[in-house]
């Protein structure tokens, strides 16, 4: 499959590039920094690179791909995650392809006996005001996507902690609830998330839905 990875040089994006190549996909890595993409290409010489602001991507460019992965991150301007999702959706409205894949956050998952949102717990953490907009924006991004009916998309949320690391060969998989392993830990490695995302677009199970994975 022909796959475009937006935000390819980041932790999630680079792991997705690796997993997609392992699955036999033809991968194009997108980002604004030519230097970062060139470094990524040193690790994965078989990729193509497209150094360009994601907001400048055109419909014609997206239609060249079977899958477009949004692994974009903008910690200081997290609202851009919502804007980019809307931009990508706008470009492929009423098209059968590409399928849009969004890396979301854990804040939109539910937890506890009352099934409250994880973001509500995060908001109570010390100094949360300095970073809470990030999980809030990821929640709003998912809420927006849930109203999108004429575009093929799916979202994938990691668990409470999202860390760099290899894939778990036997990950936990869920839908709307925060996953916790047998040791009481809730974390997802970048490799686990990447493998789950690539598996989903090769073997679709979550059509216009979000799901979640965690290391067991």
Could you describe each region identified by the protein language model?
Residues 114, 148-149, 163-170, 200-209:
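Glycine/proline-rich active-site loop of Rossmann-fold NAD(P)-dependent oxidoreductases
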Residues 3-23:
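N-terminal Rossmann NAD(P)H-binding glycine-rich loop of SDR-like oxidoreductase domains
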Residues 25-32:
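Conserved glycine-rich Rossmann-like NAD(P)H-binding loop of the short-chain dehydrogenase/reductase
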Residues 77, 107-112, 161-165:
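Conserved catalytic-site region of short-chain dehydrogenase/reductase
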Residues 137, 184-198, 209:
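Substrate-positioning beta->alpha
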Residues 87-133:
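Conserved Rossmann-fold NAD(P)-dependent oxidoreductase catalytic core, especially the SDR/UDP-sugar
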Residues 36, 41-97, 205:
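NAD(P)H-binding glycine-rich loop region in Rossmannoid oxidoreductase-like domains
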Residues 143-163:
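Conserved beta-loop-beta element that borders a ligand/cofactor-binding pocket
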């Amino acid at each position: 499959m022909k796959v475009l990875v937006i935000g390819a040089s980041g932790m999630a994006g680079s792991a997705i590039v690796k997993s997609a190549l392992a699955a036999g996909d033809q991968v194009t890595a997108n980002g604004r920094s030519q230097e970062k993409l060139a470094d990524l290409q040193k690790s994965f010489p078989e990729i193509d690179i497209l150094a360009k602001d994601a907001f400048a991507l055109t419909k014609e460019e997206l239609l060249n791909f079977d899958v477009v992965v949004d692994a974009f991150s903008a910690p200081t301007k997290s609202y851009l995650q919502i804007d980019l999702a809307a931009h990508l959706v706008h470009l492929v409205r009423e098209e059968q392809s590409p399928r849009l894949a969004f890396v979301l956050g854990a804040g939109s998952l539910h937890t506890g006996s009352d099934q409250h949102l994880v973001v509500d717990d995060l908001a109570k953490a010390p100094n949360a005001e300095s970073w809470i907009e990030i999980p809030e924006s990821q929640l709003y991004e998912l809420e927006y996507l849930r109203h999108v009916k004429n575009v093929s998309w799916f979202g994938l949320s990691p668990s409470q902690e999202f860390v760099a690391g290899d894939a778990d060969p036997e990950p936990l998989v869920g839908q709307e609830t925060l996953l916790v392993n047998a040791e009481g830990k809730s974390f997802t490695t970048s490799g686990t998330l990447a493998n789950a995302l690539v598996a989903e677009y090769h073997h679709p199970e979550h059509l216009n839905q979000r799901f979640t994975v965690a290391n067991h």
